[in-house]
Amino acid sequence: MKRFLLPFVMMLVFSAESIFTDLVHFPFVTDDQVLAPRFLMLVLIFMSAFINQKHAMIYGFIFGFLYDMNYTSLLGVYMFGFAGLCYLASKAFKVLHTNAFVVILIAVLAVCLLEFYVFGIQSLIHKDIMTFNGFVLDRFIPTILLNIAAALILVLPFRLFFMSLKKELRDE
């Protein structure tokens, strides 16, 4: 039964990003600053840490494609970004321990890499999209702070969920 629960949970996380963006407004964030929740990226990194690389890359590819279809005009940016970062994170987890601190650190690093990757692709296509300083001050720093807080909140519930799912997958 938990096998069908994973796609449902991932769809909820996918939907939670846009709901969070629409409904949550912080008083200390100016109108110029952008808080981009990357909950899906965090959960995919948690999946690569606690289940396995194959599941994380498949879900990263599928949900990256859905992300591209819903939020961008360019197909493939998030699709390959999510899957590639899941691959890199799983290789890092083979070397490092998968305790909560290391998982949070790698997840936040993956969000950093994703933000710079997307900014790089967008700045190649649209030359006048945003300056690098504007990107760092108005988008990157608020996004990273939000995702650090989200990673701290989400790591333990998803660790328990993924560990029980991994046990059930192993038993089958």
Swiss-Prot record:
BP terms from Gene Ontology: regulation of cell shape
Transmembrane parts of this sequence: 4-24, 33-53, 57-77, 101-121, 143-163
Keyword annotations: Cell membrane, Cell shape, Membrane, Transmembrane, Transmembrane helix
Domain of life per record: Bacteria
Compartments reported by the entry: Cell membrane
InterPro entries: Cell_shape_determining_MreD
Membrane topology annotation: Multi-pass membrane protein
Family matches, as Pfam families: MreD (PF04093)
CC per GO annotation: plasma membrane
Function text: Involved in formation of the rod shape of the cell. May also contribute to regulation of formation of penicillin-binding proteins.
Protein family according to the UniProt entry: Belongs to the MreD family.
Protein name in UniProt: Rod shape-determining protein MreD
